[in-house]
């Protein structure tokens, strides 16, 4: 066969292969189930995603953020009368439906610069998280809000990290990475309950049966990152050991007619003293002169302080753990508790 004929034959074979490949891939595309195509569309619309241990950080747009924030979950079910009024800055009682609508309306879109900033932080965090065998949801949403729905604080719900726009604008790259790491721990904790309890136990916290004092129920302040206050820690009071469960409540009903105060300004962090059977004593002594000592302030006991835990964020073992999680990933082992928790986390390392 002549060289020219050989070349022509080769081209024909090449065209045939390309043609057959095109038909095959087109057929496979038609054979995709409707749900798979829908998922493909969702994936393509989820801009700036970063895979983390089988999970994907996704910046939620305003529409999806509104849908997420206006839906019910464990957090919204736990909200007290004060929670609802203070978040909406209302002197009148607020219904759950009113709050959900209000929360949804706080969702905002991301600017191009914000997207770049967030994904830079997520990329660094991925490299750190990849070493651990931890369960994560398929998708970790990052929702930007006006901040009005949660007193301009960063928080989590289910598989979402919610950040107020002021935080997003004002934090530098290092601060954003630390903030995203802290909030990511709450998602990890939620999806890894056994790991969470091991980390709590390493700090000295154990599950216990605690009933919130009845007189304070309407004033209870709910932390979306940790809605349960049923974790006890042994401290010393007047030379004697006593188990306490930290919790938060408002000093008084919401009464700000100017609508300038955030609910954080009403917070009192105290501890509920429990007996050996882990049953809560329900008389709030500090609110009733001469009452039994059942509600204690942090300064009323020894062993529940910054020196003990290496952080001033003492409102819940979940927040203490999140602070140390940031230090672990930064390899800052200045405080001995950080190293202790790091060793516990090592048990989840990939082999």
Can you say where each PLM-predicted feature lies in the sequence?
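Boundary at the C-terminal end of the N-terminal hydrophobic targeting segment
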Residues: 31-36
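Catalytic Zn2+-binding segment of zinc metalloproteases
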Residues: 184-200
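N-terminal mature-domain "stem" immediately C-terminal to a signal peptide or N-terminal signal-anchor/transmembrane
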Residues: 37-112
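Active-site scaffold of zinc-dependent metalloenzymes
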Residues: 148-177, 181
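Bacterial N-terminal signal peptides that target proteins for export
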Residues: 5-17
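Auxiliary, metal-adjacent structural segments of Zn-dependent hydrolase domains
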Residues: 100-157
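Bacterial N-terminal signal peptides
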Residues: 17-27
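Metalloprotease/metallohydrolase-associated module, dominated by Zn2+-dependent proteases
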Residues: 201-342
């Amino acid at each position: 066969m002549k060289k020219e004929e050989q070349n022509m034959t080769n081209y024909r074979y090449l065209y045939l292969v390309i043609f057959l490949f095109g038909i095959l891939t087109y057929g496979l595309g038609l054979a995709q189930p409707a749900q798979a195509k829908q998922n493909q569309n969702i994936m393509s619309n989820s801009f700036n995603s970063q895979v983390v241990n089988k999970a994907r950080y996704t910046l939620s747009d305003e529409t999806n953020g509104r849908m997420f924030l206006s839906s019910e979950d464990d957090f919204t079910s736990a909200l007290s009368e004060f929670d609802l009024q203070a978040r909406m800055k209302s002197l009148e009682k607020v219904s759950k439906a009113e709050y959900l609508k209000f929360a949804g309306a706080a969702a905002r879109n991301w600017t191009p610069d914000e997207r770049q900033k967030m994904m830079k932080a997520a990329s660094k965090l991925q490299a750190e998280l990849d070493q651990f065998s931890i369960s994560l949801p398929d998708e970790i949403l990052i929702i930007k809000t006006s901040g009005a729905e949660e007193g301009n604080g960063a928080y989590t719900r289910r598989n979402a990290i919610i950040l107020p726009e002021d935080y997003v604008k004002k934090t530098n790259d290092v601060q954003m990475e630390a903030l995203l790491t802290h909030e990511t721990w709450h998602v990890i904790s939620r999806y890894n309950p056994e790991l969470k309890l091991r980390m709590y136990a390493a700090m000295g916290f154990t599950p216990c049966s605690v009933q919130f004092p009845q007189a304070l129920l309407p004033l209870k302040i709910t932390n979306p990152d940790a809605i349960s206050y049923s974790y006890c820690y042994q401290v010393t009071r007047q030379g004697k050991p006593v188990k306490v469960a930290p919790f938060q409540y408002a000093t008084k009903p919401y009464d700000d007619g100017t609508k300038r105060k955030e609910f954080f300004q009403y917070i009192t962090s105290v501890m509920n003293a429990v007996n050996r059977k882990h049953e809560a004593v329900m008389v709030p002594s500090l609110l009733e002169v001469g009452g039994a000592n059942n509600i204690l302030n942090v300064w009323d006991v020894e062993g529940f302080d910054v020196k003990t835990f290496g952080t001033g964020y003492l409102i819940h073992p979940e927040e203490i753990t999140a602070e140390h999680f940031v230090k672990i990933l930064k390899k800052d082992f200045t405080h001995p508790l950080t190293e202790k928790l790091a060793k516990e986390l090592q048990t989840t390392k990939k082999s």
